């Protein structure tokens, strides 16, 4: 597999590596460079393309250009923390359906607040690389399933069981 390394014109801290034939793109947002590299390397080894950002503000600057399939967010970061970043991503119609995962200490507060703003998954640090990969793959599969259902609904091809509950069709 040929791998090309590219430099972007985005802020200096952003990292992007083009992986021909990549099975998906992940935007990794963490202020700790070592954690960003750890996540990046493990996801790239699984054939995923990874773009990194050092904080939530940088994430919001690049998300529309990067168009990731999944975003991982640390919680405690300078400028804009992960929970406020998640809330802003959910408020934007262009990013509201992107799968979001918090990769952090995952305190009770972080989990409760994350659920309130629409975070899809949580992974506590320190984590096993296999757990990270499994979580990202599951989020990507869920997103693909959501997109397929949305296209079926647009095309008017939604299948239903024909059973009725209160006069309304029941969808599987």
Regions found by a protein language model. Name each.
Residues 1-25, 130-172:
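Non-catalytic signal-transmission and effector/linker regions of two-component phosphorelay proteins
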Residues 77:
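Receiver (REC) domain active-site loop signature in two-component systems and cognate sites
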Residues 54-58, 69, 81-87:
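Acidic catalytic/metal-coordinating carboxylates
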Residues 47-54, 62:
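Short hydrophobic/Thr-rich beta-strand motif most characteristic of the beta2 strand and flanking loop
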Residues 84, 106-123, 130, 134-138:
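Alpha4 helix (beta4-alpha4-beta5 surface) of REC/receiver domains from two-component response regulators
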Residues 66-72:
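Active-site beta3 strand of CheY-like receiver
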Residues 37-45:
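Charged docking surfaces used in two-component/phosphorelay signaling
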């Amino acid at each position: 597999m040929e791998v090309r390394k590219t430099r972007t014109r985005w802020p200096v801290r952003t990292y992007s590596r083009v992986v021909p034939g990549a099975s998906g793109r992940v935007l990794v947002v963490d202020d700790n460079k070592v954690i960003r590299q750890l996540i990046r390397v493990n996801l790239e080894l699984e054939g995923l393309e990874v773009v990194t950002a050092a904080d939530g503000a940088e994430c919001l600057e690049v998300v529309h250009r990067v168009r990731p399939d999944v975003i991982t967010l640390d919680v405690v970061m300078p400028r804009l923390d992960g929970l406020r970043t998640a809330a802003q991503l959910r408020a934007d119609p262009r990013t509201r359906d992107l799968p979001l995962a918090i990769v952090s200490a995952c305190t009770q507060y972080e989990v409760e607040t994350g659920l309130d703003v629409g975070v899809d998954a949580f992974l506590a640090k320190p984590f096993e690389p296999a757990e990270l990969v499994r979580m990202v793959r599951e989020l990507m599969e869920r997103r693909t399933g959501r997109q397929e259902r949305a296209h079926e609904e647009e095309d008017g091809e939604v299948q239903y069981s024909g059973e009725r509950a209160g006069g309304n069709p029941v969808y599987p």
